[in-house]
Each structure stands twice: as C-alpha cells, then as structure tokens.
Amino acid sequence: MPNTSSSQSFTIFVDGWLIRHRYFVEQLMCASSLDETNRISLEEQQSLVAQFLSHCLQYYQEKFASVSLAGDNVFTFFCPPWFNSYAKLILWVGDFKPSLVFKLTEVSVADLTRHQKDRISSLKSETRRKEREVMRDFALVQQSVADPPVMLAARRVGAVGMVDGEETDLEEAMEVLKAGMAAAMNNADQLRCSTVGKVVEILTPPQAIKVLRTIGQLHLRLRDRDQERA
C-alpha cells in the first residue's frame, strides 16, 4: 500500500466494513428486543458478542496498518473523510472518546448490580487516567514542533528562504510530529478497544448485547456519510 494512498485504501475498507456493521447492528437490535420466551440461547448471545467485538477489532487493526503506512497522510486520520460532519464535532484523537462507553452503558442497561456498578466506576477512573496520559503525550509531540528554532525555519519557508541546516531541522521536526501523532492515534485506539472489552467482561451477555447495540449505532452515526445526504 503506497504512502500516498493509505487513507484512500482505508476509506474503501470502511465502505465494506459499514455494510457488515449494519448487519451486526441489526442482529444486536433483534437479540436485545426479544422477550425471555423468544430470546436466543446464552451460547448464541455469547457468540454474537464475540463476533461483534471481532468485527470492531478488525476496523482498528486495519486502521493501525494504514496509519503506520500513512507518511504525510497521517494528518488525514485526525479529521477523516470516512466520518461525517456530526462525528467531527466530537472527535478525540481521531475517533470517539473511550470514556463515552460508560455513558452509553448507563443509558443502555438499567439492571446493573451494585458489584457491576463498582467495577465499572473503577474502570471509568482508570480509563480517564489513561485518556489524560494520551493527551499529555500528544501535547508533548505538538510542543516539540512549536520550539522556536523549528518555528523560525517554518516561517522562512516561502519567504526569505532558510539558512544552512534549517531545512533539515524542519524536516526532522515534521518526521517527529508525524511519528508522534501516529503513536498517539494508536494508543488512543488501543484504549478505545480495551475499554469496550473490559466493560463487556463486567456485563452479562444480555446486558452486553444492549450496550454493543448502542455502540454499534454510534459507529453508524459517526461513519455513515449517507446521513449527510439525507
């Protein structure tokens, strides 16, 4: 996959991924709407949960590969064309904020036990701490590019021209920025995936199906560009 087309290739992947995603969301909606008499078996519920998590993981694995090859196009992944304008209003390091999962859990499940609530509360604190770590590292990368020598060289571009060594310094700074942004993106995506997985581990299969249904619907809302043409 050439550097110049990594984001384009990922956009094509997302189009196919969304087709499969709609199918999974329909399955989750159906499973969560059945009463106890008609509900699918526990094994079928567990299988559906596992399949959906694997499906979501595939998205982030493909994204990781694309970001790793993106080169200059890494910046595209922070305001991606496969997200609609609604999604871009709430982007956090290129996707949804991991702690949003806890809000979605609250609105999806009304029968959490006290033990489950305590575990989720502990996980929420851990997730928010890790979110701060991601943002701290991201800020340090941005700060390194804003250092006076680099900014001076950047201002000379297209103006009076750069003196000896400044062009190399600027190129090196941009490489550091791109690598740092890619690392921040990957760390954020890992936190997104692990947070969903850990929440699901706390829930029963019927509860997990309800939460994943809501998360799946959010994925559609963020990524379905057809909404903008509706």
Swiss-Prot record:
<dbReference type="GO" id="GO:0006351">
    <property type="term" value="P:DNA-templated transcription"/>
</dbReference>
<keyword id="KW-0938">Abscisic acid signaling pathway</keyword>
<dbReference type="GO" id="GO:0009738">
    <property type="term" value="P:abscisic acid-activated signaling pathway"/>
</dbReference>
<dbReference type="GO" id="GO:0009788">
    <property type="term" value="P:negative regulation of abscisic acid-activated signaling pathway"/>
</dbReference>
<dbReference type="GO" id="GO:0043565">
    <property type="term" value="F:sequence-specific DNA binding"/>
</dbReference>
<keyword id="KW-0804">Transcription</keyword>
<dbReference type="GO" id="GO:0009651">
    <property type="term" value="P:response to salt stress"/>
</dbReference>
<dbReference type="InterPro" id="IPR025422">
    <property type="entry name" value="TGA_domain"/>
</dbReference>
<keyword id="KW-0010">Activator</keyword>
<dbReference type="GO" id="GO:1900070">
    <property type="term" value="P:negative regulation of cellular hyperosmotic salinity response"/>
</dbReference>
<protein>
    <recommendedName>
        <fullName>Protein RESPONSE TO ABA AND SALT 1</fullName>
    </recommendedName>
</protein>
<dbReference type="GO" id="GO:0009737">
    <property type="term" value="P:response to abscisic acid"/>
</dbReference>
<keyword id="KW-0805">Transcription regulation</keyword>
<comment type="function">
    <text>Negative regulator of salt (NaCl) tolerance probably by enhancing abscisic acid (ABA) sensitivity.</text>
</comment>
<feature type="domain" description="DOG1">
    <location>
        <begin position="7"/>
        <end position="230"/>
    </location>
</feature>
<dbReference type="InterPro" id="IPR051886">
    <property type="entry name" value="Seed_Dev/Stress_Resp_Reg"/>
</dbReference>
<dbReference type="Pfam" id="PF14144">
    <property type="entry name" value="DOG1"/>
</dbReference>
<keyword id="KW-0346">Stress response</keyword>
